[in-house]
Amino acid sequence: MKKLLFLFVSALVGMTVFAQDEMPTVNWPYLYPDFIQGELMQIGGGTSKGQYNIHLGQGALHLVENGQIGEISVQTVMKVTIGEDIFRNVGGRMYKVLAEGKDGYVVGETLADYSAIVRDDGAYGGSLSNAAKGFSYDENYGNYSYLVTNDYADLLSIKNESEELPVTKNTYLVIDNQLYPANKKSVLAIEGVDKKVFSEFLKSNDIKWKEVVDLVKIVDYITSLK
C-alpha cells in the first residue's frame, strides 16, 4: 500500500512539474522540458546513471552524453528511473509506471500526434518542415525518433522556435509482461476471464476505469486467476 501511494504521489509530482513548464514542441519532442538525472537498470542486472528523457515519437529512451543526444536500445533495458518517475520496458517501448500490483502494474503512455501537425486544414501550421529547419515530414516519415539536431545545446536553444506538439495519452494494464488497454473489452479478451464473474467483481468493488487505484485491483484480480 505504501509503495502504491508513493508511485501515485510521484505521478502527481511529475505531472505538476510538466504542467508548469512549456509543452513539447516539434523541435523538442520529449516528455520532460529537459534531460533529467536518472538511473537505468539493465535486464542482466547492471545499472548506470545519466541524463535521460523519453522521446514522444516511439516511447524511446534518449540519453545526453558528451553534449550529444543518443538513443538507447531498450532491448537491454528493464527499467529506468527519471527523477521520481519509473519507466519499464514493455515490448520494446518505455512506459511510465503509474502503480504496481502484486504481479503486474498499470502504465501510462504519452505519444506525439505528428499527423495533427501535417493536416491539410492548416491546423498547427499545416506543415512540419517550417518548424524542423528543412527536415520535411515526408523525408522522415516512419522515423518518429528523429531530431532536428543531435547536439544537446543547439536543440535546447531552439526548442521553443516551433509549434506545440500535440500528444495523445493512453493507459494500459501490464500482466505477464503483456500490454492490455485499460478497458473492459480488452480485459474480457484475456484467457481465463469469465464475463459474468468479472462483471460482478467490477460491481462489488465499485471499479472506475479512470482511477489508477481501481486499475491495480483489476491487475491483481487477473493475476490471481493464473
How would you name each of these model-derived features?
Residues 43-45, 67:
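Glycine-centered tight beta-turn/hairpin loop motif at sheet-sheet or coil-to-beta transitions
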Residues 21-37:
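Short N-terminal segments immediately surrounding and downstream of signal-peptide cleavage
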Residues 1-23, 218:
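Bacterial Sec-dependent N-terminal signal peptides
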Residues 37-43:
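A short beta-strand micro-motif
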Residues 155-210, 214-217:
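A short, solvent-exposed beta-edge/loop patch
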Residues 52-181:
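Aromatic-patch recognition
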Residues 214-226:
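A cross-kingdom marker for long, charged
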